[in-house]
Amino acid sequence: MRAFPRVLPFRHQRSYNNILLRTVRLFGSSLSSFDFSRQMPKVDPDNTAAMLLQKNLIQRNNMLYGYGSGTIRCTLLDSTGRAKSPLVEIKREDLVSKHGLLPRDLRKIEKSRKNDLVPSLLVRENSILISLLTVKALIKPDMVIIFDSAGSGITLNSEAHKDFINDMKLRLKNQETSELNSDPLPYEFRALETIFISALSNLTSEMKVLLTICKGVLQDLEFSITRDKLRFLLGQNKKLSSFNKKAVLVKDMLDDLLEQDDMLCDMYLTDKKAGKIRVQDDHTEIEMLLETYHNYVDEIVQKSESAISDVKTTEEIINIILDSNRNELMLLGIRYAIGMLSLGGALFLGSIYGMNLESFIEESNYAYLTVTILGLISTVWLYAKGIRHLHKLQRMTLLSKIKTDSVHELLKK
């Protein structure tokens, strides 16, 4: 039993009232069905607004995820592909007892607040429980139960879910039409194939969007490199890495399934219901089905890895360019420092010549010219020597670095 949170502080009453007005507009139907006069005690009107808001949000959250009621929202499809009703709530105990499941099998379905990155496919005595991206379903030889994936952003009332249900109905009906031929695969494999098609089409759409955005950013970086573009590229690289991880997990799941012959044989639910026993290697249909989508997922993984490699290569090139620019700025600063040092030699001679001391150098007619020439010569000599040494450092190559390391190793020995 989930406890309600405490009443929020009184100092935020005006903010809560504004939030309540927005909530009433969004969830007016939910608020109107709740009898506040019987459920809530009479308190301060401002505190009442905050309490009503919290009560409504908690009730809405419990309604979506079935907390406290022990039921799971789902859609039932019979052997002919017809839905028994648009929305059914099944008790957790009924799912476990009637369909031969274990209580831990429903953990992902009940607690799926977010997208499950790790897909799973469990084969039981007379059912297949699959959790693949946004689709969570229980497949039987004559029935399919599709669970609500509200936590992943796709609810039973969404257009994406309705399209998926329509595709599932069409495949399960298995009637030959002008657009679709009759499928010789058994009932459970047709349902499984529909789930794979839906999941992989979502992966493909997401991949196309990510690749298009990344390609545009990389092309823009060829003309100008700005901080905003680099920050945006970093965000896209994170999204690509997350997408690649998701695709790799789907591929790994298919790899594990293809390596387990006993599980592949157990997936023939229709044959098991009819009493037909499959031998260890008699699973050609399901193996070909899984290999087809394994190759498709592998192609998605390869494309995403190629895009990630392109982004990393671009980042390395940008780092090289930025390092080169930084080195040029450092060299410019060193040249200015060498110039100031060489100029200091001339100033030193001039300062000695200008001291208010008796040196009798002023009596010579060539003293000023001599000091000036010596100052210029010292300035040019110091600057040339510094620049020559700087050029030697710039011409240092990898081969010279290896030779230097070899000499140091020989000296140590």
Swiss-Prot record:
It is found in: Mitochondrion inner membrane. Its main location: mitochondrion. The chain crosses the membrane at residues 329-349, 367-387. The keyword rRNA-binding does not apply. Pfam families: MRS2-like. InterPro entries: MRS2-like. It comes from the Eukaryota. The keyword Transit peptide applies. It is a multi-pass membrane protein. GO terms for cellular component: mitochondrial inner membrane. Residues 1-35 form a transit peptide. GO terms for biological process: mitochondrial magnesium ion transmembrane transport. GO terms for molecular function: magnesium ion transmembrane transporter activity. N-glycosylated. Glycosylation is important for correct localization of the protein. Glycans are attached at N202. Belongs to the CorA metal ion transporter (MIT) (TC 1.A.35) family. Forms homooligomers. Interacts with MRS2. Present with 396 molecules/cell in log phase SD medium. PANTHER family: MAGNESIUM TRANSPORTER MRS2 HOMOLOG, MITOCHONDRIAL, RNA SPLICING PROTEIN MRS2, MITOCHONDRIAL. Mitochondrial inner membrane magnesium transporter required for mitochondrial magnesium homeostasis. Modulates the conductance of the MRS2 channel. Involved in the splicing of mRNA group II introns in mitochondria by affecting mitochondrial magnesium concentrations, which are critical for group II intron splicing. This is Mitochondrial inner membrane magnesium transporter MFM1. It comes from Saccharomyces cerevisiae (strain ATCC 204508 / S288c) (Baker's yeast). The lineage of its organism: Eukaryota, Fungi, Dikarya, Ascomycota, Saccharomycotina.
